[in-house]
Amino acid sequence: MSSNFEHDHEENEDYGKQFRPDREIYVVKKDGSKELFNVQKVISAVGKSAYRALTKFTKEEKENICQYVVDKVNELEVDEIPIPIMHNIVESALEQVKPIVAKSYRDYRNYKQDFVRMLDCLLY
């Protein structure tokens, strides 16, 4: 079953061009690899969480999330941000903009962590 709603959460606008930190900042992933921070990845992730919560963001809400995240990243005054810190920043932005999506975002993160722990228990 395909609906228009499934495609509504995807948007062509690149917020990474409009909202940038004031310097190059890298996100340090769980495996230790580093990726240049781009707020467009945040918008993609929160869009998926909104979809799971059966809602979507307005353009203004997306811009508010971007501005919040970039402001917080700039405030840290570091060149590298561990992914758990980035998740917390994004979650805080969502709490301000659309709390139901913050819950979806948090629940999905917890689900992934629980799944990894379960696999670790089975494998070791």
Predicted regions and their residues:
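Extended catalytic cores of very large enzyme megasubunits
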Residues: 1-124
